[in-house]
Amino acid sequence: MAVVSLSEMMEAGAHFGHQTRRWNPKMSKYIYCARNGVHIIDLVKTALCMNNAYKWTRNAAKSGKRFLFVGTKKQASDVVAQEAVRCGAAYVNQRWLGGMLTNWSTMKARIERLKDLERMESSGAIAMRPKKEAAVLRRELERLQKYLGGLKGMRRLPDVVVLVDQRRESNAVLEARKLDISLVSMLDTNCDPDLCEVPIPCNDDAVRSVQLILGRLADAINEGRKGSNDQRKV
């Protein structure tokens, strides 16, 4: 049985690619045709890729792999946070800061700073500071929550990065590849499938398409972790 049906993908607009002049020729094997100057993605191929991605992700979760969801564009931001939280993954949904992976020791220190500030705020310690100092600390807290809030539970580097919009998140791709971190990537017709281990050809601009794909991947992670827990109980 297919993880996602053709009708679900059609309704989500997953088949709409970019304008033909913006395509990457490496995506040709996933393109069905061109219509009115826009490439149409072959959803039969997408369904097959999604089946593979589901199994791969489920098995990775079952073996204890750690996941990071990345998608900072406006139409993906809320979905990335929602689905990452649902499956217990870390996430980046506002802005990719250089060195988030390759300079992990520094990033980890900033995350600890965020946790310290949150403890200070909840305990009332910030409120007890002079007004100007409290304002500075709260601005720092707000900034760290915005950019690093989704990483608070990530104690080590992830094993897998789940990506929305390969081109926009090119720095995340470069850092992951430099560290041999696996990439599960939604690929629109302007992307390069050679830059990821697990390709999912689909529209990465439509909210419903992003919701559909990330939702299924989150399901796979939850299913894999349940299987891992069941094995430990035996």
Curated annotation (Swiss-Prot):
Signal peptide: none annotated. Keywords: Ribonucleoprotein, Ribosomal protein. PROSITE patterns: RIBOSOMAL_S2_1 (PS00962). PANTHER family: 30S RIBOSOMAL PROTEIN S2 PROKARYOTIC AND ORGANELLAR, SMALL RIBOSOMAL SUBUNIT PROTEIN US2M. Belongs to the universal ribosomal protein uS2 family. NCBIfam families: rpsB_bact (TIGR01011). This is Small ribosomal subunit protein uS2. The gene is rpsB.
